[in-house]
Amino acid sequence: PDLPYPAEDLGFKPEHLEIVRGAMNRVTNTDEGTAYRYTQVEEPALQIAGKTGTAQVARLSVGERLRMLNDVRSLDYNRRNHALFVGYGPLKRPRYACAVIIEHGDSGGRSAGPVVLDLLQAAIVGNSGGQPNMVNDRYNLVGRNDEA
C-alpha cells in the first residue's frame, strides 16, 4: 500500500545515499559481503540489502576470543556477543525495512541476517498476493542449551 502521505525528505544528498545503498548491497549480494552466505537469493525481486552488526556483551580475554572464533559454544552463553542486522527490500525498489537483534546470537550476518531476509521476503511476497515461504531451518542460532 502507498503511504498516506509522502515520506519526509531528510536532506541527504543523493550521491551519499547511493554510496550507502551500494555498500549495503555488497554486504548481502556479493561474495565479499559479511552476510552473503546467509542472505543470498536467486530471485532478483526478493533480493535485499543490509548491514551486519555485533555488540560485545562482556570483556573477553585473548584466550576466550580465540576459543570463540573456533566455536562460539565454548563461551558461556551470557558472555556471547549480541547479533544485529538491519536491511531493506526489495533491493531495486525498496518498500520495507527491518531490524533484528538476537541477544547472545554472536554474529549479525549468520544469526540475524536470515531472520531479516525471511521477514522482508514475507512482506514482499505477501503484499504482492503470493504465499510467503519461510525457511526457518536455515537459522544458525545457538541457544542457551547450545542447540544449533
For each of these PLM feature ranges, what is it?
Residues 1-9, 15, 24-130:
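Active-site beta-strand/loop architecture of penicillin-binding DD-peptidases
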Residues 131-148:
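Short, highly charged C-terminal tails/helix-capping segments
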